[in-house]
A protein has these predicted regions:
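Glycine-rich flexible loops
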Residues: 1-169
Length: 169
């Protein structure tokens, strides 16, 4: 996954308090998810959403990405969590906004800050990552995809593997 030719002039500008778009470009349909995250975690200054192959495969399986090795530990000592499946009521009420609330709920239930785990899998959906700027948020999305690829291959080789021992991570 790479961001090629990112052009800030091709990005929509949205007021995070009101949700009003002040540019000519239409914001992403996931904008309400981004806005909820920015409001809940003011230290987050950029959010990236992907449907990368391996991480999204874990999301579609409703599985966290467990920490099997030091490469994962270099990114975070925690598993990359997966939210619970969104309810039918929340889906029909305001899917994108409630997706953001589900991300917040998951992090709070785990007792982990968004910078201890700078990304999450949304069940049956995809990946959201964040950071102090766009470059960091993209790098976090790339790291989650790489870790998911390693975890996938590790599970193929040894399906009943245990997570990395704490003294190594």
């Amino acid at each position: 996954m790479r961001v090629v030719g990112a052009d800030i002039s091709k990005m929509s500008v949205v007021d995070m308090k009101t949700g009003v778009c002040s540019s000519e470009l239409k914001p992403s349909v996931d904008e309400p998810t981004h806005r909820v995250l920015y409001q809940a975690f003011p230290e987050i200054l950029s959010v990236v959403h992907t449907h990368s192959k391996y991480a999204t495969s874990f999301a579609q399986a409703n599985l966290e990405i467990k920490n099997y090795g030091t490469t994962h530990s270099d990114f975070t000592k925690y598993s990359i969590p997966c939210t619970e499946v969104i309810s039918k009521e929340l889906l029909t009420e305001s899917y994108e906004k409630n997706t953001g609330k589900l991300i917040i709920k998951t992090l709070k239930e785990l007792g982990i800050s968004p910078f201890e785990i700078p990304g999450i899998l949304v069940a049956n959906h995809g990946v959201f990552s964040w950071g102090k700027d766009l470059k960091t948020a993209v790098k976090n999305a790339e790291s989650i995809e790489y870790i998911a690829n390693l975890a996938f291959n590790t599970l193929l080789i040894k399906p009943k593997i245990s997570i990395i021992p704490k003294h190594i991570s």
